[in-house]
Amino acid sequence: MRSAARVLLSTFLLLAAAASAADMKLEARLVWGTDDEKGGPNCKPVDPELAAKLHGMFKWKNYFEITNQIASIPLNKTRDLKMSDHCTIRVKNLGASRVELSCLGEGKPVDQRVETLTPPKWLVWGGNSKHDTAWFVGLRSDDDKTGDAAKVVSKN
């Protein structure tokens, strides 16, 4: 009887581990690129590591983080991440580190794509804004078990 209980408990724990392994934990950041010295009242400069990577790819002098969201998305499920009053990111976990991404600007589709998120690399996409500024959305899988080692940015 005890061995049956052990087998049942082991099976339950394995199923729970497999189910959570299918969940994707990701980080999303809304970033504003500008030549202005200050961001808005709710903006803060992006961390130096991400700023260095953005400076290497884009022309703006300063990059300000507007929103930082963490989400856990079960396999084959979709989550909406409200990045600002004007920007929502819709993310569907397709499995195997693949995601279907939709960017909604003021409720209207702006861009849709399927990408692979490879920890700890950043996926960055964005567009022009008013007054020679730009917005960027940075996404990365937060499933990396190795910690913060060698975080990099990829331009897609």
Where are these regions (language model features)?
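Outer membrane pore-forming secretion/assembly proteins and partners of Gram-negative envelopes
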Residues: 22-156
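Bacterial N-terminal signal peptides that target proteins for export
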Residues: 1-9
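Hydrophobic h-region of N-terminal signal peptides that target proteins for export
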Residues: 12-20
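N-terminal compositionally biased, intrinsically disordered segments and leader/signal-like regions
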Residues: 11-12, 147
